[in-house]
Amino acid sequence: MATLEDSFLADLDELSDNEAELDENDGDVGKEEEDVDMDMADLETLNYDDLDNVSKLQKSQRYADIMHKVEEALGKDSDGAEKGTVLEDDPEYKLIVDCNQLSVDIENEIVIVHNFIKDKYKLKFQELESLVHHPIDYACVVKKIGNETDLALVDLADLLPSAIIMVVSVTALTTKGSALPEDVLQKVLEACDRALDLDSARKKVLEFVESKMGSIAPNLSAIVGSAVAAKLMGTAGGLSALAKMPACNVQVLGHKRKNLAGFSSATSQSRVGYLEQTEIYQSTPPGLQARAGRLVAAKSTLAARVDATRGDPLGISGKAFREEIRKKIEKWQEPPPARQPKPLPVPDSEPKKRRGGRRLRKMKERYQVTDMRKLANRMAFGTPEESSLGDGLGEGYGMLGQAGSNRLRVSSVPSKLKINAKVAKKLKERQYAGGATTSGLTSSLAFTPVQGIELCNPQQALGLGSGTQSTYFSESGTFSKLKKI
């Protein structure tokens, strides 16, 4: 009898046979599996305790070359972009594009270093990462605190707001962390220094891009300013990428979650990024800032497209867009027009009410008060009325069901509804005469003093014996004489 171990081994043999057949039939799949195995091997050999294995951007040749060019460009003044050249062929624009890509890489590298610091420092103060979200602020706070257990001895006033400092101090008293070993603490401090160096390099790159915005993107700079234009280009990945981006995405570029430390978020601005730092947005009343942000984003996208095609190197279009934005915001702030007094209607201009007619009579007949309702609404003097619940409770019935004078009160027909005598006579004749038909009360026997009972023609009274009947068989009639031809 086979054991459980033998059955497992048999299943593994079958799986190995199937894998061999698949490798023979499809060689590409085998290559992909080898690549995956290589990647997994690299991940296994990666040492997360070593900062150099995690963060490699600062030691790359591309980082060193771009930073060297940026420092040289900041040290000397430049006249701007060369006139008459295509934007993509301009060496200064190429450097700006490289700086934009490098700024994105620096942002990603800061996030990697931030995660490294959090993984190491959570043994000391795990709750700090939920209180301080920004990577640079977190690195500064960690470098300031170190292995200190009493935060009252640490001055964080120049790093965090007073409300956040109070929350951090209270949370540090209840944390379950312990002091870090000396080697781990040195790695954490080194990571903090690297994060700060990356942040200073990013600021230097943005400063260079900002200084060149007047020549590279004059229209965009005229709307949002050079600093915001540089940040937008750096986040989007260049002027061409920014020109292809829709306005709804430009509006949220640079938007970050704000740490309110338990306070209400009802008054915080949502879905606003770098455009919040523009002069137009800051000078707009709070109730109109959301609309102003959408308008600035739309016009900034148009200005970026003009700059990408080098359509207006002087920035006239950008100034026109800015003036249009200003006029629209002023128009929004204007009070609504005063309510005009309503003029009086012209005398006798209203249509007269219809007081008669067939439709109105039918409607009055349909909604007139019935006889039962009239009796229910009428009460006899000195006679109590009956009620639905008895003893005068409930709905009263009035004179319904009471013995009266045994005389039926019939309402007279209104004079307007009566027909005249002539019309009534004609209706009566139609009813009994029936036209040419003989009435059932008419008899063909007549009593005369000469012969007694004799037959008579009942149609003689109607004058039907006329025409040929009166002359053809008449005693006084003569024969017709025909004249021969």
Swiss-Prot record:
A motif (Nuclear localization signal) lies at residues 352-365. It is found in: Nucleus; Nucleus, Cajal body. Residues 11-36 have a biased composition (Acidic residues). It holds the Pfam family Nop. Residues 352-361 have a biased composition (Basic residues). The keyword Protein transport does not apply. One of its GO terms (cellular component) is Cajal body. Residues 334-348 have a biased composition (Pro residues). Disruption phenotype: Developmental defects, semi-dwarf phenotype and reduced growth. GO terms for molecular function: RNA binding. Keywords: mRNA processing, mRNA splicing, Nucleus, Ribonucleoprotein, RNA-binding, Spliceosome, Stress response. SMART domains: NOSIC. Residues 1-36, 329-361 are annotated as: Disordered. Belongs to the PRP31 family. Involved in pre-mRNA splicing. Required for the assembly of the U4/U5/U6 tri-snRNP complex, one of the building blocks of the spliceosome. Functions in association with STA1 and ZOP1 in spliceosome dynamics and pre-mRNA splicing. Required for transcriptional regulation and pre-mRNA splicing of cold-responsive genes, such as LTI78/RD29A, KIN2/COR6.6 or COR15A, especially under cold stress. May play a role in stress response. Involved in transcriptional gene silencing of endogenous transposable elements, independently of the RNA-directed DNA methylation (RdDM) pathway. This is U4/U6 small nuclear ribonucleoprotein Prp31 homolog. It comes from Arabidopsis thaliana. The gene is PRP31.
